[in-house]
Amino acid sequence: MLSLAVLVSGGGTNLQAIIDAIENKFIKDAKVDLVISSSESAYAIERAKKHGIKTETIVPKSFSSKEDYDKALFECLSKAKPDLIVLAGFLTAIPAKIIAGFRGKIINIHPSLIPSFCGKGYYGIHVHEAALKRG
């Protein structure tokens, strides 16, 4: 069975879609074992808890340095040993150490063409509004 760690920052609609797809057997032989949120107020945490999924909250601003945050996130993922890390609306940059340490095991769900519509402010409906505005 494929072990998934899903990283989130907000409402968790992508997380819910993954959970539903697993429960409906659209995604087979996979299980979300861990949800990590970069925000204490992310509704995604509640979605995970409703399905009995372990959650961790690792808020970048609660660390004295970027290096300390990077280390905490890396250690959390290393302990979980996921087969796949899914960035599902995760609004924090992924540290190079994680990219190197989990090479070939990270996918990003992003709702638009990168790099044209990414970065600060490009989340949720805002991505689509910007794309439509540009034409």
Residue spans of the language-model regions?
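One-carbon transfer enzymes
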Residues: 1-135
